[in-house]
């Protein structure tokens, strides 16, 4: 469960390290986002010479959450941290590599490029 002011780790090599959610996209009164949802983030921490800079505003898709995700078969999956991947307006990742596992729920949300770059899909 990601909401406004939530800090997330960045799971790609775009140059950002930490981001903060400033808006959950998908409706005027939507307050909560989960895996596969698109949010608007502000870059809070970035590395030198990266593609993005501190203070930039970008879109991101959530790939891992600490709150468990319920699946249709009754199982649940959760992670230690909240993580996101920065994307452009067309929904393509800004970075060229993805770090750490991502969930199968991204497949249903049409983020196949992120799934193909990820080292592990759970």
Curated annotation (Swiss-Prot):
It comes from the Bacteria. GO terms for cellular component: cytosolic large ribosomal subunit. PROSITE patterns: RIBOSOMAL_L14. Keywords: Ribonucleoprotein, Ribosomal protein, RNA-binding, rRNA-binding. This is Large ribosomal subunit protein uL14. HAMAP family: Ribosomal_uL14. It comes from Paramagnetospirillum magneticum (strain ATCC 700264 / AMB-1) (Magnetospirillum magneticum). Belongs to the universal ribosomal protein uL14 family. PANTHER family: 50S/60S RIBOSOMAL PROTEIN L14/L23, LARGE RIBOSOMAL SUBUNIT PROTEIN UL14M. InterPro entries: Ribosomal_uL14, Ribosomal_uL14_bac-type, Ribosomal_uL14_CS, Ribosomal_uL14_sf. CDD domains: Ribosomal_uL14 (cd00337). The lineage of its organism: Bacteria, Pseudomonadati, Pseudomonadota, Alphaproteobacteria, Rhodospirillales. Part of the 50S ribosomal subunit. Forms a cluster with proteins L3 and L19. In the 70S ribosome, L14 and L19 interact and together make contacts with the 16S rRNA in bridges B5 and B8.
